[in-house]
UniProtKB/Swiss-Prot annotation:
Gene3D superfamilies: 2.40.50.100. Residues 12-32 are annotated as: Disordered. The lineage of its organism: Bacteria, Bacillati, Bacillota, Bacilli, Bacillales. This is Large ribosomal subunit protein bL27. GO terms for molecular function: structural constituent of ribosome. Keywords: Ribonucleoprotein, Ribosomal protein. Residues 20-32 have a biased composition (Basic and acidic residues). Residues 1-9 form a propeptide. The gene is rpmA.
Amino acid sequence: MLKLNLQFFASKKGVSSTKNGRDSESKRLGAKRADGQFVTGGSILFRQRGTKIYAGENVGRGGDDTLFAKIDGVVKFERKGRDKKQVSVYAVAE
């Protein structure tokens, strides 16, 4: 009697793959100047997505919602009502 010993091997090598190993670069959002700090006009005060903090006196809002100083002065973070915050820049009396 004839016995056949058949063994089947993989025709392709098993290649490992992963769904990990990627991450987006941080966007460096948040406060760039502190309360009471002196700033010049055009200085970035706060980088954000959406309006987490609103623009107050002498503060402009850029296309990406970045808040910047319009004049030279002192930064002041304030409450705007019960649940909102704003940042203003006040001129310093010389």
